[in-house]
Design a protein with these regions (language model features):
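Conserved SGNH/GDSL esterase-like catalytic core that processes O-acyl groups on lipids
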Residues: 2-6, 15-127, 132, 142-150, ...
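Short hydrophobic segments within beta-strands
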Residues: 8-9, 136
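Active-site His/Glu-centered metal-binding helix of metallohydrolases
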Residues: 12
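Short glycine-enriched loops at secondary-structure junctions
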Residues: 137-141
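Single conserved hydrophobic/aromatic residue that forms the stacking wall/gate
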Residues: 159-170
């Protein structure tokens, strides 16, 4: 039986490419040779099954007033159950949490991630084993990146990040 790894994330997990000139195929989604999830699958080999659950715009817990069902918290039960048994869950979220419309600071984003982790642990998808969750910090937003989607919130991600100590404190 293969070891099942589920990668739950946002556009970084989906493989969204903001500038098609940066993509070998010239499209808006990186190909299987470029996406980190596919590279992980290749590196691990046939004894593992790496599954992408990436969605552009996905947040940890923040309900988007413009686009519905974008928060991982409200959909994680169904997502995790649809992929059970999960041996490792990789969470790579937080970039979209800094959108200006959410008004969240680093501590609030960290608390949201902790809430999502606790919810994921409670889902019966682990085959009777202890939940195994790896949180990967999203890459920094490049300086000067600002648009109508992210707003001024992207400046927050340049200079702050949720404290891993604060996230561990509630365990």
């Amino acid at each position: 039986m293969k070891t099942h790894i589920l990668c739950l994330g946002d556009s970084n997990t989906h493989g969204y490419c903001a500038d098609p000139k940066d993509n070998a195929d010239g499209g808006i989604r990186f190909n299987e040779n470029e996406r980190w999830t596919c590279r992980l699958q290749t590196a691990l080999g046939d004894k593992y099954l790496v599954t992408e659950e990436g969605l552009s715009g996905r947040t940890t817990v923040f309900v988007d007033p413009i686009h519905e069902s974008m928060d991982a918290l409200s959909v994680c039960y169904a997502l995790l159950k649809s992929h059970e048994v999960i041996d490792l869950l990789i969470l790579m979220l937080g970039t979209n949490d800094v959108k200006e419309r959410f008004g969240a600071n680093a501590a609030c984003i960290g608390a949201g991630m902790e809430r999502l982790i606790q919810k994921c642990k409670s889902v019966d998808c682990w085959g009777g084993k202890t939940p195994n969750i790896l949180v990967v910090a999203p890459p920094r937003i490049k300086e000067g990146f600002h648009d109508e989607v992210m707003g001024d919130g992207c400046v927050c991600l340049l200079y702050t990040s949720p404290s891993p100590r604060d996230m561990r404190r509630s365990r």
